[in-house]
Amino acid sequence: MSSRVVKSRSKNPYAAVQVDPDSDYITPGTLDLEQLFWTSTGAQYAHVNQVWPSVYVGDEKTALERPGLRVLGITHVLNAAEGKWNNVLTGAHYYTDMDIQYFGVEADDKPTFNISQFFCSATQFIHEALSHPKVLVHCVMGRSRSAALVLAYLMMEHGLTVVDAIEHVRQRRCVLPNHGFLRQLRALDITLQEDRLRQKRGMQEQ
């Protein structure tokens, strides 16, 4: 990827950005991130897939099939499509007799929607859920909203770059966050790279 993009500090979402001049890593532009999903080596679509130890990404069917959740051993559900329109109507009450912890976010699968407002809370829920695994993160199709939140979790909690997170997840599930979500994940990647650079320079000054 880095050999095909131009190094830039521009805020242009279509430009690549190199945050750390001593690193070979470059945050790709949004269009380059989209291209990562269009190769033929990714996973085929399924209702639910394990994308990280004890972390599952699934669709509406998976979230609604209570017997299937028991078989999977799901203990926590993150509904990335809470609400009434083009969303999954479950809620905490749907799982009251299953000893499942529920967390819902009202996210629209639109490029203009600010899903980054849920990156921190979703990451915290997934992280805490893994002390009592397993967690299902879902939306309607399990491809855009839920995928964006899991990608953010891998970046924020496990230190993956946006490129590494995408490559990891797409090998295990057929996902495709919308263009706006990718733009926000790209911005998160730059922010995390800047944080790490500040930490590195701070340690060098000690």
From Swiss-Prot:
Function: Dual specificity phosphatase able to dephosphorylate phosphotyrosine, phosphoserine and phosphothreonine residues within the same substrate, with a preference for phosphotyrosine as a substrate. Involved in the modulation of AMPK and MAPK1/2 signaling pathways.
Keywords: Cytoplasm, Hydrolase, Nucleus, Protein phosphatase
Superkingdom field: Eukaryota
Pfam families: DSPc (PF00782)
PANTHER family to which the protein is assigned, alphabetical: AGAP008228-PA, DUAL SPECIFICITY PHOSPHATASE 29
Record-given protein name: Dual specificity phosphatase 29
Family named by the database record: Belongs to the protein-tyrosine phosphatase family. Non-receptor class dual specificity subfamily.
Record lineage: Eukaryota, Metazoa, Chordata, Craniata, Vertebrata
Organism expressing this protein natively: Gasterosteus aculeatus (Three-spined stickleback)
Single GO BP term: negative regulation of MAPK cascade
GO CC, alphabetical: cytoplasm; nucleus
First-tier enzyme category under EC: hydrolase
All copies of domain Tyrosine-protein phosphatase, residue ranges: 47-194
